[in-house]
A protein has these predicted regions:
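Hydrophobic/aromatic-rich alpha-helical bundle segments in the mid-to-C-terminal region
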Residues: 106, 110, 123, 138-181
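Amphipathic alpha-helical packing segments from all-alpha helical-bundle domains
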Residues: 65-69, 97-100, 115-140, 146-150, ...
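Helix-loop "lid/cap" segments that line or gate small-molecule binding pockets
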Residues: 76, 90-98, 106-114, 178-182
């Protein structure tokens, strides 16, 4: 069921779960805590989501769909931007603890073994993003490779890891500039 077709109560549960998963992690948040936070009943929860695993899948799909929409907009709609400007926007869209990518990034480390179907949606998104970045790089550099697109994603992931450490300075700009040196 598409998110736009979910009733208000189900959307409330979905948003509460996304917030709690982002803040505390997938393993530290149980169904009872989500139900309490969403101010709903167990019957409502199980009617729409059937299980915590299904809720995790839907939460990640919600984030993934939002990210895809933004990336497509940056690459294909915002024609006035240069490739470097588009890469910058995509980078900062992802390298943000308050952004849509934080939950899928967290899922990489927390749910691979316990929720393989939900984890696969994150893998699918990352592969999609690599292809989009690769095609974007090809528009100005015919020698661009898939490895360049992979490296861009690794730079995003590195920035996220640094942001998660409160004792490290925010070096997102420096990481991105280092990557862009090869394309500027």
């Amino acid at each position: 069921m598409p998110h736009s077709d979910l009733p208000f109560r189900a959307l409330g549960v979905l948003h509460s779960a996304r917030f709690l998963f982002n803040k505390y992690g997938f393993h530290n948040v149980g169904v009872d805590r989500i139900i309490e936070s969403a101010n709903t009943t167990k019957a409502t929860f199980y009617n729409y989501f059937h299980s915590k695993e299904r809720l995790i899948e839907m939460s990640l799909t919600f984030q993934k769909d939002g990210l895809k929409h933004e990336v497509i907009s940056i690459i294909h709609v915002q024609k006035e931007l240069t490739v470097i400007e588009k890469l910058r926007k995509i980078y900062y869209l992802h390298a943000d603890l308050d952004g849509l990518y934080h939950l899928p990034f967290k899922a990489i480390f927390e749910i691979a073994k316990t929720h393989p179907k939900a984890y696969q949606s994150v893998v699918d998104y990352r592969n999609w993003l690599i292809n989009e970045i690769y095609n974007l790089l090809l528009t100005t550099n015919s020698n661009a490779s898939k490895q360049d697109a992979h490296m861009f994603l690794f730079v995003i992931d590195g920035a996220m890891v640094q942001l998660l450490d409160p004792n490290k300075p925010d070096e997102r700009k420096r990481l991105l500039e280092y990557f862009l040196l090869g394309f500027g």
